[in-house]
Swiss-Prot record:
InterPro entries: Ribosomal_uL11 (IPR000911), Ribosomal_uL11_bac-typ (IPR006519), Ribosomal_uL11_C (IPR020783), Ribosomal_uL11_C_sf (IPR036769), Ribosomal_uL11_CS (IPR020785), Ribosomal_uL11_N (IPR020784), Ribosomal_uL11_N_sf (IPR036796). Forms part of the ribosomal stalk which helps the ribosome interact with GTP-bound translation factors. Belongs to the universal ribosomal protein uL11 family. GO terms for molecular function: large ribosomal subunit rRNA binding; structural constituent of ribosome. This is Large ribosomal subunit protein uL11. Keywords: Methylation, Ribonucleoprotein, Ribosomal protein, RNA-binding, rRNA-binding. CDD domains: Ribosomal_L11. GO terms for cellular component: cytosolic large ribosomal subunit. Coiled coil: none annotated. GO terms for biological process: translation. The gene is rplK. It comes from Alcanivorax borkumensis (strain ATCC 700651 / DSM 11573 / NCIMB 13689 / SK2). Part of the ribosomal stalk of the 50S ribosomal subunit. Interacts with L10 and the large rRNA to form the base of the stalk. L10 forms an elongated spine to which L12 dimers bind in a sequential fashion forming a multimeric L10(L12)X complex. Gene3D superfamilies: Ribosomal protein L11, C-terminal domain (1.10.10.250), Ribosomal protein L11/L12, N-terminal domain (3.30.1550.10).
Length: 142
């Protein structure tokens, strides 16, 4: 018989840095999940990613307190800031520009985000990422 799903927990955890402190510990603890088991499994799967990159994760908790989790790609804003070499986006994106990204960089980010985007084709994915860049105060070249 299939296990019954008890809860879905959505978190954003730094790659390779999951530990029992908040936000991971309380979110998993209230559902009775073995927190250290999740931390070890998550850190093992995120070893190849940039250390500290925020990774969205969806944890499925079953009624027997077992769990599975699926990781998504880092947020577009994080990837754009990394590509532009900036710490944070603009507070006034329409007037203050804080950096530039090229079409090639947008294509690279769109390719990385492809599994999580709902775009019909690659061009639509690039336009989606370009819109995110503009809303952060980045100039889009090309």
């Amino acid at each position: 018989m299939a296990k019954k799903v008890q809860a879905y927990i959505k978190l954003q955890v730094a790659a390779g840095q999951a530990n029992p402190s908040p936000p991971v510990g309380p979110a998993l603890g209230q559902h009775g999940v073995n927190i250290m088991e999740f931390c070890k499994a998550f850190n093992a799967q995120t070893q190849q990613l940039d250390a500290g990159a925020p990774v969205p994760v969806v944890i499925t908790v079953y009624n027997d307190r077992s769990f599975t989790f699926t990781m998504k790609t880092p947020p577009a804003a994080y990837l754009l800031k990394k590509a532009a070499g900036i710490k944070s986006g603009s507070g006034e994106p329409n007037t203050k520009k804080v950096g530039k990204v090229t079409r090639a960089q947008l294509e690279e980010i769109a390719k990385a985000k492809e599994p999580d985007l709902t775009a019909a084709d690659m061009d639509a994915a690039v336009r989606t990422i370009a819109g995110s860049a503009r809303s952060m105060g980045l100039d889009v070249e090309g």
